[in-house]
UniProtKB/Swiss-Prot annotation:
It is found in: Cytoplasm. Its EC number is 5.3.1.1. NCBIfam families: tim (TIGR00419). It holds the Pfam family TIM. The gene is tpiA. It comes from Leifsonia xyli subsp. xyli (strain CTCB07). It is an enzyme of class 5 (isomerase). GO terms for molecular function: triose-phosphate isomerase activity. One of its GO terms (biological process) is glycerol catabolic process. This is Triosephosphate isomerase. InterPro entries: Aldolase_TIM, TIM_sf, TrioseP_Isoase_bac/euk, Triosephosphate_isomerase, Triosephosphate_isomerase_AS. Keywords: Cytoplasm, Gluconeogenesis, Glycolysis, Isomerase. GO terms for cellular component: cytosol. Its main location: cytoplasm.
Amino acid sequence: MRRVPLIAGNWKMNLDHLQSIAVVQKLAWTLKDAGHDFGAVEVAVFPPFTDLRSVQTLVAADKLPIAFGGQDVSEHDSGAYTGEIAASFLAALEARYVIIGHSERRTLHNETDEQVAAKTAQAVKNGISPIVCVGETAEDLEKHGASAVPVAQLRAALAGIDSAADFVVAYEPVWAIGSGQAATPEQAEQVAAALRAVIAEALGDEVAAKTRILYGGSVKSGNIAGFMRETNVDGALVGGASLDVAEFAAIIRYQKHVI
């Protein structure tokens, strides 16, 4: 089964709404000028929540073939949860995706596997495709190997959804994020294959075959092609490099470097 690659840019807590508009416009122009085929490689951006309405308006008005989504979502429908964002709010903004379980959420906000599962279920219930992030720390890697922790995290996240759900998995080794030291393509492939096996076990072979698995962690234009040659790697979740339009566009256009 052919899986359309997805290159997603997580802007984290960077860019205000005016800056986000400028970056999306410049990215769209750059890719259009380069003749990018959006049907061959999907593009998505994840601005801060305060920027989403501006990005939605721009994408709709200019009919830009760029998807967008939230960086996190609440595990609750609504209520007295100060500062949280309901999945229904993201759906009202026509967000296609939402990032769930990013290592920064797990580490800085002590997010548990149970919360990740609840957030994943909320996204699916509201028609949003969750990008479920999993990954091991350097200590985990040394103690348990590369795939043990990501496999356990994904297994927990899938507990709240069924085979009809549309979701994406992002493998982000914590030791690689923002470090400049990426995993090797072979390491990413090993873990991605293990994650696909977990999906097959939980939801069946058909779901596993169609689910996209991304790699994230110090992705740049100079190494993306190596990851994309691997059988089970279907794209990338890009952090800091996605803030540089020229660099992000070069990552998106990785196919010209793949032989």
